[in-house]
Amino acid sequence: MSISWWEISVLCHPNLEESIFWRLDQFGCSGTARETKGKSFLIRAYVPKMQAQTLDLAALSLWLKQDAILLDSPPPLTHWKLIDDEDWASSWKDHWQPTEVGDRFLIYPAWLTLPQDGDRLILRLDPGAAFGTGTHPTTQLCLESLEMRLSVPNKEIIIADIGCGSGILSIGAVLLGATKVYAVDIDPLAVDAARSNRHLNQIHPATLVINQGSVAEVLELAPEGVDGILCNILAEVIIELIPQWTALAKPHAWAILSGILIDQSQAIADTLEQYGWVVAALWKQGEWSCLHVRRS
């Protein structure tokens, strides 16, 4: 039996994108997509009709406005409408096309026919309900940072991806030559999406290990520690996780951190310094930053 879905459309200032994705995820939305509308972003997301009433949607709209106030940004415009199951399955995908990232990656939607030629590393992806399609500046900054970090061949490199979402960064690391990647996320839907994308990219489960959890779960899997840490989540969550990385990171480990607005980067840097890390570089794209850090 076909079910109906709410299509939620949010027109927002670009620096609200991360908080809106997070809020929509907390609301239970699936299949988010983003497109540019002039100087603004239009974000679409979907939630089953049975899971949300109009009062719930009105509350969501209010929360998004409150989030914007906290981030000192203009309030977003939120609209919603009902669509049927078939429309949901195809609607958000219509707005997502292959995306070149950095010098080496081509992020390729799983439902499109693969190109016959080209010299880029093809990273096939169907994010499902998980964050990470390659269109967000933080994801692109992380992938570009991985290109730089893994440009010199290493005999062996083990990486942890904390809050892996769709698995896009983990898969990118494997394609660039990482020996082993441990990817974890507290969201079971993200774990399912990451495992599906691992299969799409024909990566062996022993090379990319994906489990539900966080730092503690990686420590159980890799008690010897890791050479690199990837973490593209909200800044306040990164601050909470930094103290736990001491036991996880090898003495000369590095980390690539994003999900961080430029004006949040100093607080991250201060916390890193308290726990024996130093910021080696800071890359920017729009309102977003990516920190390259290493153990001091």
Curated annotation (Swiss-Prot):
Coiled coil: none
Molecular function per GO: protein-lysine N-methyltransferase activity
Keyword Amino-acid biosynthesis tagged: no
Keyword tRNA-binding found: no
Pfam families: PrmA
GO cellular component terms, semicolon-separated: cytoplasm
Enzyme type, top EC level: transferase
Catalyzed reactions per annotation: L-lysyl-[protein] + 3 S-adenosyl-L-methionine = N(6),N(6),N(6)-trimethyl-L-lysyl-[protein] + 3 S-adenosyl-L-homocysteine + 3 H(+)
CDD domains in the cross-refs: AdoMet_MTases
Residues that, per the record, bind S-adenosyl-L-methionine: T139, G163, D185, N232
Function of the protein: Methylates ribosomal protein L11.
SUPFAM superfamilies named in the record: S-adenosyl-L-methionine-dependent methyltransferases
GO biological process: methylation
Protein name: Ribosomal protein L11 methyltransferase
NCBIfam families for the chain: prmA
Source organism of this protein record: Rippkaea orientalis (strain PCC 8801 / RF-1) (Cyanothece sp. (strain PCC 8801))
Protein family per UniProt: Belongs to the methyltransferase superfamily. PrmA family.
Subcellular location: Cytoplasm
